Amino acid sequence: MKVAIIGATGYGGIELIRLLEQHPYFSIASLHSFSQVGECITNVYPHLRNVLFHTLQEIDVKTIGKEAEIVFLATPAGVSAELTPKLVAEGLKVIDLSGDFRMIDPSSYELWYKRPAAKEEILRKAVYGLSEWKRTEIQKANLIANPGCFATATLLAIAPLIRSGMIEEDSIIIDAKSGVSGAGKTPTTMTHFPELYDNLHIYKVNQHQHVPEIEQMLTEWNSESQPITFSTHLIPISRGIMITLYAKVKQKMEIKQLQKLYEETYEQSPFIRICTQGKFPSPKEVRGSNYCDIGIAYDERTERVTVVSVIDNMMKGAAGQAIQNANIIAGLEETTGLQHMPLYL
């Protein structure tokens, strides 16, 4: 199956290239860029020498429609909203890695992203691509809104609790930490090496744009859901996310009940690994893979549950989940082309 990538020179785009070039059923038909049209991809990323020979092309929707069946959009917020209706009209399946189609309510997007939302007509066609929880909808979709990296790690961690009604809906506190690749390719003072090395930054306190998509899913799972407290931190690693989530339970329980809940919830999900009781994951253990590792604790004294989840923000948080969704669309095993052992070092 032929695929195209729009926004091929960003971090999300280059991770898509790495995965698709090794995929047994998908092949890259074309790579597209806004700013580097005519450049060979190896001039932008020399590590692809003798591996990939594509020249970056301009974005011609009709040509893409003739050459590919699936198109991945690894573009900044706002770009996909303009391009996607044209791509869908050409009969393409679109998987968008930006936030443009994640929110059902356009006013919510405009509030959190500070830009105009996509038209409601195309928003209604989008399926939120949280692979483990939206398989049936993804199979039938023409437009997938790939979840944000923080949202993915958070939702996979909290789903069993919020769906079961075990926790007080207004008690959810999330502490999120991300590697610097999550900030994208464009350098800033905060991501500058001397500023980040041996340091960490808290940012977008109570204002991170992944909050509304998290709350949207929580409400879908549990109509009693309430706004969450969510803080994000930038840490000096290149890739990886750790979510530490706290919530108060409605009635006393034992850790073995929680452990069983998580193990049973995800027993049919090959990319979700539940740590043994008393063990907790770290980002290094999923680096370069599509896994989400989850550990659970329960404090009988405070009656609070703590859930720790880790993902690679470039994989399960972006390109890996996008290809997992493409596999589902294509009727393939969702692990196809994604069974990479974590790098660790």
From Swiss-Prot:
Pfam families: Semialdhyde_dh (PF01118), Semialdhyde_dhC_1 (PF22698). SUPFAM superfamilies: Glyceraldehyde-3-phosphate dehydrogenase-like, C-terminal domain (SSF55347), NAD(P)-binding Rossmann-fold domains (SSF51735). It comes from Bacillus cereus (strain B4264). Its EC number is 1.2.1.38. InterPro entries: AGPR_AS, AGPR_type-1, NAD(P)-bd_dom_sf, NAGSA_dehydrogenase, Semialdehyde_DH_NAD-bd. Belongs to the NAGSA dehydrogenase family. Type 1 subfamily. This is N-acetyl-gamma-glutamyl-phosphate reductase. It catalyses: N-acetyl-L-glutamate 5-semialdehyde + phosphate + NADP(+) = N-acetyl-L-glutamyl 5-phosphate + NADPH + H(+). Pathway: Amino-acid biosynthesis; L-arginine biosynthesis; N(2)-acetyl-L-ornithine from L-glutamate: step 3/4. Catalyzes the NADPH-dependent reduction of N-acetyl-5-glutamyl phosphate to yield N-acetyl-L-glutamate 5-semialdehyde. It is an enzyme of class 1 (oxidoreductase). NCBIfam families: argC (TIGR01850). One of its GO terms (cellular component) is cytoplasm. The gene is argC. It comes from the Bacteria.
